[in-house]
Amino acid sequence: MLKWVQCIRRRPELTVVEFRRLWVEYGEEVVALGAEVGAFRVEVSASLAVEANLAWRLQRGSAAPFDGIAELHFSGSAPEFFEVLKQPGPKGHVDRLLLLQEGLVDVPHSCFFLASQDVEAEFSLPPD
């Protein structure tokens, strides 16, 4: 399984509120792209402004969390994925994502990459 991962930092001039508003629109476009390419799962998440995140960062000396993370799960290979992205429907969504990124993403401090999923586990909570 292939995952297209986007770890996004917001442009410095955007407030968290402005980023979140634009992130929803960006996420909708990622979901639409996922539908076009036959993805079997799409995840779009935004980091939380909570004390725990700051505490972990200070304790560990780590970088700030990404503002948003988008993952598109695809059952084919990397060459198949890139071939599908060239088709008119998916290409239109990619073009819109690139346009949205101009006003949203601090590209030099973000990252975009393909990954394989090596371990997966699902748990269900016992009923109350």
Question: Which residues does each predicted region cover?
Answer:
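Macromolecular interaction modules
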Residues: 1-128
